[in-house]
Regions:
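C-terminal capping/lid segments that line or modulate ligand- or cofactor-binding pockets
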Residues: 5-27, 32, 86, 401-424, ...
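Generic recognition of well-ordered alpha-helical segments
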Residues: 51, 253, 431, 485, ...
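The feature captures the catalytic groove of carbohydrate-active enzymes
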Residues: 260-262, 387-402, 450-500, 515-595
């Protein structure tokens, strides 16, 4: 099945390899092939906001919840999100010799190389595929190896055709894609042939349609061209494909196109593929070099793998320092006692172990690498944002394949900061800024307000509201939440060109909306207090507004006043805007606007707790907390925000810990457990954080490491839902949670190894990022050994919190660094010059500068 495929890609083009020895499929996809959307002009219903607020003030919340939605429906508004679809399938069928044995699939993440191999009649059959980063094309090699074999036994057929998913009933739009499909076969002698495929699809259309990147509306063709090059065999033209016989090796190169007229695309790709003369190995080497730079931009080793990494490094030193050989070798032998775990097992073994008990150290490390691998293969700074299925979704109507900004899009990108893949956020910023005109129209038409209102769900061709239900339409927090990503990118890059041309145009629009949207009242003591309504805590409903038990209604009444999340977003956003105003100069924004921002901040009250001691999800008493839910929106001040953390706010943390602990386990999803793990890491509770990741691996992980929304087996950790859709935000959230356990980074503050669990007790990381520098660490918690290297990227001042197991710290003296101890295990470090380096180490003699495992 496509859900079990081996994924590879270059961020623009993706390939999923699945099938078997008889019939193998390369599912070919691109970031920009979306279809079957509808974007209508948004009708002006802004007067509904006044009616809605009046009903809310009167306590008629259920009726008020539908006010704007009903106004849209009464005017016949019916926009529809697009679906992300594959471009084509390359289907390869091979005639068996005696039947397969020893079938094996593998994925080399370091080279982005997917492969399958098996034995048939003593012949080693091998298939390998990658997508070149040097030249945007898929490269696929088929080979058969056996000394003295009769090659006439080898026979393959190749077909390049429209994507079809067995069992999926065609809608009118799907049938139109199938009916428009065209194929052509060209053979140039016995050793070179071409397969050409084209179809057409309906783009998002409608009276108010905003097309993709100003491309010609009529340019709806998409397709692929594949070149087959045969070594020592011969090919034969078939009606809809090519037959290859007796080949030692077959090299297939494939180029894809979207929104390009068929004839010109076919000619362009035939010319470019035809001029390609490099071998598979040469093409792989040049692509892998580019891929490795991204894959190794940050690195992690755990347990035995950290030992082996240190051993390799030590081995290099040993060659230079023969006199120390015996001691170091013996040290590594002894250290094996700390890491008694067999490594190198199959995914199936690792996943079964996680299902039966808990994750191994090997699985934790592999999942961290795999999430990053999918991220760099599934998007790029110049492409669309990473979608929930990456580039590997295998249906025409994938469930929830759009860009969803009430959790999922944010989770996909959280890891990119610490993980040193910061530039990938540019895909989100370009995507959102291109849609600012649409978001401003949304704000005017729905609310009668200037500025930006971004509906939570969008696709490349549809920026207007689509999911016309109260839980989506009435939530105005999406744009403010994404503003956090804009602001953090600036903190990490200090790029003033970006600030003026990208960040400020977006954040200024968000500020303009909130300035008009907020209302004020006074509390019992005469202090001004904010009223933010309608306000939604994403997808949750207060328990006192839930229907009677046994009656199932999706999102029955989400529309409230002053949800904790909305107020958290508002507080964070305007604090950041005040900082931005100082950076660009206070005269950049009118003084009256800055005064309004300060007024809003002053009017946001301290967040209150309920009778159980948990921070309230809605700050108004008429809304009661509901724990049977997956979203953790009201924990925003702890994560993904930085407002509350243990060292700064020890008195506040308990209320947030209590709120998380009350969430019911059978209401969770793959992504919510990753989110919860990151929260527990912020609480400095490594045990609970890892328990969440264990639960995620137990309930939402396929054998190819794709993650799902929920368990598909009717178990009791996640919610039950059929189908259980692929959602790759969970694996990205997993990466982030592991990083949060190893490094906490807030502006001007970092905590080293803040939330270790026993399976993270031995490890090494390199080039983890905080806003102004790079952190590399080695540690062995059991031996109380620790080493940290901090490399600044610019002069700055930062507080550094040492790990709990480090009783004292030492550092190398340098004129470029000023260090002061603030309190136990907390230092304030000022880097006076760029490119200096500070080294902290503990637990060995000064002459021994390495952690011994």
């Amino acid at each position: 099945m496509w859900r079990e495929g081996l994924a590879t890609g270059n961020g623009v083009t993706g390939v999923s390899l699945y099938g078997g020895a008889k019939r193998e499929i390369l599912q070919l996809g691109r970031h920009d092939l979306w279809y079957d959307g509808l974007e209508e002009e948004v009708p002006d219903v802004h007067e509904a906001l006044g009616r809605q607020r009046k009903k809310m003030e009167e306590g008629s919340f259920r009726e008020a919840s539908w006010e704007i939605v009903n106004a849209l429906k009464e005017k016949g508004y019916d926009s529809r999100l697009e679906s992300h679809i594959p471009v084509a399938n390359l289907v390869v069928e091979q005639t068996p010799i005696k039947g397969f044995r020893s079938f094996r699939r593998s994925l080399d993440m370091e080279q982005a190389l997917a492969s399958q191999q098996w034995l048939d009649g003593g012949v080693l059959m091998r298939r390998e595929v990658f997508v070149s980063r040097a030249v945007d094309m898929a490269v696929y090699r088929l080979s058969a190896e056996k000394e003295g074999m009769n090659r006439d036994l080898l026979e393959y057929t190749f077909q390049l055709s429209v994507f079809r998913n067995e069992g999926e009933r065609p809608t009118e739009a799907i049938q139109a894609v199938w009916d428009a499909a065209q194929t052509e076969v060209v053979c140039e002698g016995e050793h070179t042939g071409y397969l050409l495929f084209n179809s057409r699809r309906e783009k998002a259309a409608g009276a108010g349609s905003r097309q993709y990147d100003n491309k010609d509306v009529s340019a709806t063709d998409f397709g692929a061209v594949a070149k087959l090059s045969v070594e020592e065999g011969r090919l034969e033209k078939l009606e809809n494909g090519i037959k290859v016989k007796a080949a030692k090796e077959i090299l297939v190169t494939i180029g894809l196109y979207v929104d390009e007229e068929r004839a010109s695309a076919w000619q362009r790709l035939r010319d470019s593929l035809g001029s390609q003369t490099k071998t598979f190995g040469q093409l792989l080497a040049e692509s892998a070099k580019l891929h490795k730079a991204l894959y190794h931009s940050a690195e992690l080793w755990l347990g035995q793998d950290a030992v082996q990494a240190a051993g390799r490094e030590e081995g290099q030193k040993v060659n230079r320092e023969e006199g120390q050989k015996a001691n170091r070798t013996e040290g590594h032998k002894e250290s094996r006692k700390d890491t008694q775990e067999e490594w190198g097992r199959t995914n199936e073994d690792l996943v079964l172990e996680a299902f039966s008990d808990r994750q191994s150290v090997e699985l934790i490390e592999k999942l961290w690498h795999y999430g990053r691998y999918l991220f760099i293969c599934g998007s790029s700074p110049a492409a669309n944002p990473f979608p929930l299925y990456g580039l590997w979704g295998g249906r025409y109507r994938l469930q929830w394949c759009h860009n969803m900004a009430n959790e999922n899009l944010q989770m996909i990108y959280w890891h990119s900061l610490c993980g040193n893949l910061i530039e990938y956020n540019q895909a989100v910023f370009r995507y959102m800024n291109d849609r600012i005109p649409a978001f401003k129209e949304n704000a005017r038409k729905l609310f009668g307000i200037d500025g930006i209102y971004m509906t939570a769900g969008t696709t490349p061709g549809v920026s207007s509201p689509t999911q016309v239900v109260p839980v989506i339409i009435n939530w105005v927090g999406a744009a403010g939440w994404l503003a956090q990503h804009y602001y953090q990118y600036f903190l990490y890059t200090r790029d003033m060109g970006y600030a003026r041309n990208v960040m400020i145009p977006y954040m200024d629009g968000v500020a303009g909306f909130y300035e008009e949207f907020v209302r004020f009242t006074t509390d019992g003591e005469g202090r001004e207090r904010i009223l933010f309504y309608p306000s939604v805590s994403p997808e949750n409903t207060p328990v006192n507004f839930m229907p009677p038990e046994g009656k199932r209604i999706a999102h029955p009444m989400p529309t409230t006043i002053n949800s904790t999340m909305d107020l958290s977003i508002l507080k964070e956003f305007f604090k950041n805007m005040l900082t931005v105003s100082q950076i660009v100069g206070e005269d950049f924004f009118p003084r009256e606007r800055i005064e309004k921002w300060n007024r809003i901040l002053k009017a946001i009250p301290e967040f209150r707790s309920n009778g159980e001691g948990a921070v309230k999800e809605w700050q108004e008493d008429m809304f009661e907390d509901r724990y049977d839910h997956r979203h953790l929106s009201h924990i925003y001040p702890v994560f993904p925000g930085h407002e509350v953390y243990p060292e700064k706010d020890p008195g506040k943390i308990h209320a947030y810990e209590k709120a998380v602990s009350l969430r019911k386990i059978d209401a969770q999803t793959g992504w919510s457990m990753a989110h919860m793990a990151a929260i527990y890491a912020r609480f400095r509770n490594g045990g609970k954080a890892m328990e969440c990741l264990d639960n995620m691996a137990r309930s939402s992980l396929l054998n190819n490491f794709f993650t799902l929304h929920n368990d598909w087996r009717g178990m009791n950790i996640s919610l039950n839902m059929d189908p259980a859709p692929v959602q790759l935000d969970a694996i990205m959230g997993y990466v982030n949670a592991v990083q949060e356990m190893i490094l906490y980074a807030a502006p001007g503050y970092i905590a080293l190894l803040p939330a270790l669990e026993e399976r993270l007790s031995i490890g090494e990381v390199r080039n983890f990022r905080y806003s102004d520098g790079l952190v590399s660490m080695k540690w062995n918690q059991g031996r109380k050994q620790f080493e940290c290297r901090i490399t600044p990227l610019r002069p700055h001042k930062v507080q550094i919190v040492l790990p709990d197991f480090v009783e004292q710290g030492k550092w190398q003296e340098t004129d470029a660094v000023s260090i002061a101890a603030l309190r136990e295990k907390v230092w304030e470090v000022e880097f006076l010059e760029g490119e200096s380096e500070m080294v902290v180490f503990y637990g060995w003699n000064a002459g021994n500068d390495t952690v011994e495992y």
